[in-house]
Swiss-Prot record:
NDH-1 shuttles electrons from NADH, via FMN and iron-sulfur (Fe-S) centers, to quinones in the respiratory chain. The immediate electron acceptor for the enzyme in this species is believed to be ubiquinone. Couples the redox reaction to proton translocation (for every two electrons transferred, four hydrogen ions are translocated across the cytoplasmic membrane), and thus conserves the redox energy in a proton gradient. Keywords: Cell inner membrane, Cell membrane, Membrane, NAD, Quinone, Translocase, Transport, Ubiquinone. HAMAP family: NDH1_NuoD (MF_01358). It comes from Neisseria gonorrhoeae (strain ATCC 700825 / FA 1090). NDH-1 is composed of 14 different subunits. Subunits NuoB, C, D, E, F, and G constitute the peripheral sector of the complex. It is an enzyme of class 7 (translocase). One of its GO terms (molecular function) is NADH:ubiquinone reductase (non-electrogenic) activity. This is NADH-quinone oxidoreductase subunit D. It holds the Pfam family Complex1_49kDa. The gene is nuoD. It catalyses: a quinone + NADH + 5 H(+)(in) = a quinol + NAD(+) + 4 H(+)(out).
Length: 418
């Protein structure tokens, strides 16, 4: 009598290099074929929502950076828009353009990391090295406006922390760089920040082409991604997928176009949409999204160059007065003191505000009871819904394909576990 083989289970993660953080998955296998994939989450749970409810509206802002720690400023943007909607704050137009520009810089940062690490997980190492070279320059932009390369806390309810600087920090000589390399690195840093952005927008599309040369027609890359993790448009909508996970299946839905916020209605850009709903189509969507982000950044930079103005609301109940005003006006000094000791008071009400995050629809739901801190803060993380589709996407595939599916979902556990 032939022996019957039972399915066996293995642990994938949480210390697996392709688990994108602290993912633990229990995989039930029939030979090498996936029968069931059960993600175990919560290993990075820090109680962000509850922590934010114990802090003032301004103090809660830096928690947003630490949710999806690859797309920092877009998290801040969603939170600021929610507070502004509740408080009825008018954001100066220049601040809106700066926010949109940095939101698109963040989108490129995210997609470079997503595509680079996806390729690296599958076995192509060169892509991530090229991606990090470009990410380095974009993080220099973060550092120039906020002083931090990752957790910027640059956006504020009412605008942004400060205007764009009139210069870019330069690299200094060291024993690791000769004079020729130093000159090349500092070439685009001679002028203002907007000059640096223009130079980046000029050369970055060629760098995207280089990435495409490595992957798009690569036989091994296509074998590992075409037909893997297929999601139909109907199932994508039923599962609550958003962003590239939805557009890759052929559904043209982008919050920037369907429900425009800030100045996206003034921007000229296209929405890339997939056909087959597999890992390969989602990769192509991310590639094209980076090109569209460059278009938006260019439009914002051109507008900002010729339109000076304030970058934060003039209402001192929500934004601090200028330091020059505080030196002469008692009222301004009181406003400043009250704002940073007590915090802003937001009128009673509730709101749900969503933005087109690089990973999907990132939403912030706030209930205010009129106090200086949120009564309830709920975060709708796109990656949470995507991870719930893991079982359906992985079923019937080989064990090695799980890595490709995690990569295409672009999971970051800061936002999933919160």
């Amino acid at each position: 009598m032939a022996n019957k083989l039972r399915n066996y289970t293995i642990n994938f993660g949480p210390q697996h290099p392709a688990a994108h953080g602290v993912l633990r998955m229990i995989l039930e296998l029939d030979g090498e074929q996936i029968v069931r994939a059960d993600p175990h989450i919560g290993l990075l749970h820090r109680g962000t929502e509850k922590l934010a409810e114990t802090k003032t509206y301004l103090q809660a802002l830096p928690y947003m950076d630490r949710l999806d720690y690859v797309s920092m400023m877009v998290n801040e943007q969603a939170y600021c828009l929610a507070v502004e909607k509740l408080a009825g704050i008018d954001v100066p137009i220049r601040a809106q353009y700066i926010r949109v520009m940095f939101a698109e810089v963040t989108r490129i940062l995210n997609h470079l990391m997503g595509i680079g690490s996806h390729a690296f997980d599958i076995g192509a190492m060169t892509a991530i090295l090229y991606a990090f070279r470009d990410r380095e320059e974009l993080m220099d932009l973060y550092e120039a406006v906020s002083g931090a390369r990752m957790h910027a806390a640059y956006f504020r309810p009412g605008g942004v922390y400060r205007d764009l600087p009139g210069f870019m920090p330069k690299y200094e000589s060291s024993k690791f760089r000769n004079a020729k390399v130093l000159k090349q690195l500092n070439e685009s840093r001679e002028g203002t920040m907007l000059d640096f952005i223009d130079a980046f927008c000029e050369r970055f599309p060629k760098n995207i082409d280089t990435l495409e040369t490595l992957l798009t027609d690569n036989r091994i890359w296509k074998q590992r991604t075409v037909g893997i993790g297929v999601v139909s448009p109907e199932r994508a909508m039923q599962k609550g997928f958003t962003g590239v996970m939805l557009r890759g299946s052929g559904v043209e839905w982008d919050v920037r176009k369907t429900q425009p916020y800030e100045v996206y209605d003034k921007m000229d850009f296209d929405i890339p949409v997939g056909v087959n709903g597999d890992c390969y189509d989602r990769y192509l969507c991310r590639m094209e999204e980076m090109r569209q982000s460059v278009r938006i950044i260019k439009q914002c930079a051109d507008w900002l160059r010729v339109n000076p103005g304030p970058v934060i609301t003039a209402n001192h109940k929500f934004a601090p007065p200028k330091r020059t005003e505080m030196k002469t006006g008692m009222e301004d000094l009181i406003h400043h003191f009250k704002l940073f000791t007590e915090g802003m008071h937001v009128p009673e009400g509730e709101t749900y505000t969503a933005v087109e995050h690089p990973k999907g629809e990132f939403g912030v739901y706030i209930i205010s009871d009129g106090a200086n801190k949120p009564y309830r803060l709920k975060i709708r993380a796109p990656g949470f819904a995507h991870l719930q589709g893991m079982d359906e996407m992985a079923k019937g595939h080989m064990l090695a394909d799980v890595v490709a599916i995690i990569g295409t979902q672009d999971i970051v556990f800061g936002e999933v576990d919160r």
